Regions:
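Bacterial N-terminal signal peptides that target proteins for export
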Residues: 2-13
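Bacterial N-terminal signal peptides
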Residues: 12-22
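Short, low-complexity N-terminal intrinsically disordered segments enriched in polar/charged residues
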Residues: 24-69, 88
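Short beta-strand edge/turn micro-motifs at domain boundaries
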Residues: 29, 135-158
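A solvent-exposed, acidic/Ser-Thr-rich amphipathic alpha-helical stretch
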Residues: 41, 60-115
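Hydrophobic pocket/interface hotspot
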Residues: 51, 62-63, 71, 87, ...
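Hydrophobic/aromatic beta-strand elements that line small-molecule binding cavities or substrate pockets
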Residues: 107-112, 124-125, 137-142
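Short, cysteine-centered beta-strand-loop-beta hairpins and adjacent loop/turn segments enriched
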Residues: 127-135
Length: 158
């Protein structure tokens, strides 16, 4: 192997470090990851907002486009664990009946916290009970997949 000068070896090493650094810059990886996370969170938030808008219109058929085929809804009742409803058709039918039974009901999202494909919604449920305004507080934990609600797990206070 021919002997190279020290300055030649330094130049080769410097070029390799520069080239590897420009191809594999650690500064770019977090930026791309951050952009992906922001994109995912924006998609999650948009899915939750669309779902809540259709919900407050009491539009069961309007919810359907925002649900995955294998969506899961865990209701707050009956106590102690609630019931689990699986599949888009079953969840839409559940909400159709619920909207009829609770025609004056309205959910107010107090806060929506998004992390990746998950969202937590702190809400107040308003309706009339015995002619008087009534409310209940709760939390929904959503999982979003491909821009649609894959799971909505509901929890209430009291």
């Amino acid at each position: 192997m021919p002997m190279r000068s020290a300055s030649h070896r330094v130049l080769v090493v410097t070029c390799c470090v520069f080239l590897l650094g420009s191809v594999c810059s650690p500064r770019e990886v977090p930026m791309k990851t951050e952009q992906n996370a922001q994109s995912q969170e924006q998609a999650t938030r948009a899915a939750i907002d669309r779902f809540n808008e259709a919900f407050n219109r009491h539009d069961a058929d309007g919810l359907a486009p925002f649900l995955t085929e294998d969506t899961v809804f865990e209701d707050t009742s009956p106590a102690p664990d609630g019931r689990r409803i699986e599949g888009k058709a079953a969840v839409v039918e559940f909400w159709r009946g619920w909207f009829v039974r609770n025609a004056d009901a309205r959910f107010e999202a107090e806060e929506v916290i998004v992390g990746g494909n998950r969202a937590t919604v702190l809400w107040v449920y308003h309706k009339m009970r015995n002619g008087q305004p009534w409310h209940l507080r709760g939390v929904d934990v959503f999982t979003v997949r491909d821009g649609k609600v894959a799971a909505k797990l509901a929890y209430v206070k009291g």
